[in-house]
Curated annotation (Swiss-Prot):
Keywords: Cell membrane, Glycoprotein, Membrane, Sugar transport, Transmembrane, Transmembrane helix, Transport. GO terms for molecular function: sugar transmembrane transporter activity; trehalose transmembrane transporter activity. Belongs to the major facilitator superfamily. Sugar transporter (TC 2.A.1.1) family. Trehalose transporter subfamily. Residues 68-91, 146-149, 197-201, 308-323, 372-390, 438-451 are extracellular. It is a multi-pass membrane protein. This is Facilitated trehalose transporter Tret1. High-capacity facilitative transporter for trehalose. Does not transport maltose, sucrose or lactose. Mediates the bidirectional transfer of trehalose. Responsible for the transport of trehalose synthesized in the fat body and the incorporation of trehalose into other tissues that require a carbon source, thereby regulating trehalose levels in the hemolymph. Its main location: membrane. Residues 1-46, 113-124, 171-175, 223-286, 345-350, 412-419, 473-505 are cytoplasmic. It comes from the Eukaryota. InterPro entries: MFS_dom, MFS_ERD6/Tret1-like, MFS_sugar_transport-like, MFS_trans_sf, MFS_Trehalose_Transporter, Sugar/inositol_transpt, Sugar_transporter_CS. Expressed in many larval tissues at a low level, moderate levels of expression are seen in testis and head and highest expression in muscle. It is found in: Cell membrane.
Amino acid sequence: MEMEIKDENLRNSVPFVRQLSTDSVKTKTEYDNEDGTPYKSTTQKLFLWTQLLAAFAVSVGSMNVGFSSGYTSPAVLTMNITLDITKEEITWVGGLMPLAALVGGIVGGPLIEYLGRKKTIMGTAVPFTIGWMLIANAINVVMVFAGRVICGVCVGIVSLAFPVYIGETIQPEVRGALGLLPTAFGNTGILLAFLVGSYLDWSNLAFFGAAIPVPFFLLMILTPETPRWYVSKARVQEARKSLRWLRGKNVNIEKEMRDLTISQTESDRTGGNAFKQLFSKRYLPAVMISLGLMLFQQLTGINAVIFYAASIFQMSGSSVDENLASIIIGVVNFISTFIATMLIDRLGRKVLLYISSVAMITTLLALGAYFYLKQNHIDVTAYGWLPLACLVIYVLGFSIGFGPIPWLMLGEILPSKIRGTAASLATGFNWTCTFIVTKTFQNIIDAIYMHGTLWLFAVICIGGLLFVIFFVPETKGKSLEEIEMKLTSGSRRVRNISKQPENIC
């Protein structure tokens, strides 16, 4: 499937980019030039095209994640035709990827700190391709397992690295919108898997997946390492060059450079082992918020729905074809994240999480009722449309809130001192939850039936809503330094900025 995104369409697809890329802003006179002389008050234009390129490059890479997640649903329908594979082994085709992603999440933290964000991300392109080629050429289930493990490790690494890279390169005013692009393109990968999988068998679908890392690798060559990583390695001039590339040659970057340096100095001053400090009083709030969001993201059951969408429709006895239903869900998943990009910097993170929770709770309860009636031999033929309607609204709700926002906030709320280690912990925890949900999904259905499983997910969603209300801060419009200062100073919440700053550096 050929994807062409022209400059104008790209600008129009991201809220505020058109406005911010043309509006004039005044620079402050209180910041000094490198030679110590004060800046003159001048009119400059914000330069966002390079930030768009950086976000777009990472987002294309996120298609690998989505394709890996969406592969199972169409593949298992044809895999048992040409492979000698049992029902239990099929569950491992779905379960091995998140389990391996757990390992990737653990090793990804040290990698992004040692090698840098960019090199770590680019380094996954070749293994991704190797993993897909193993699956495509598999003559037994062991080769499929090996390919899924390799792809899974890469998924875990980039799941951690993408939000950190976005958080450290994009300006606060558009970080919400651009920060959701990786999730949007991840959903594109899921949609591609569903669409292409309706025409290709499991082997040829894997060949298709092997081609996705190529454009991602080429685009990442054009982008810089993050300024924050350079500063953490005392490579100040390279940090300045990177920031200049991201913000534009004629934009005042001195305040941002100064904030980066001060933040790093404070991190260096606190000293100590980053892992030991994860659960210190200073950093515990940010870590627990991140872990909580990851927990509720996965225990809503979304990956079980994505991995086994076709099977769920077969069980429902719905009049809607299971392959068509899977494609419709993929389309909704794809479109809804772009809706979120238009809303997140207007409504904020918390409002979208509220909407997300309510939508999922309502639809899971309704779909559970449908399966309960069917289980008790009550005729539900007249409601054959209900499973698709519920799952569409469920996926829509998830994709505008609990889908992208935990990953976005991973790059926002974790303090620089522990960012790599904490992101590694949160990512590993996320994929642990994903593995548990996907691997035990069929077992839970066997134990408490489909209606009980869906109602269990609904109760967990209620817990997620309460968690957001009482513990999750609003980060809209905040710089990373402001968020870190609030969360590490003992403040329970990060207050929302209702008015954007007049001066942007």
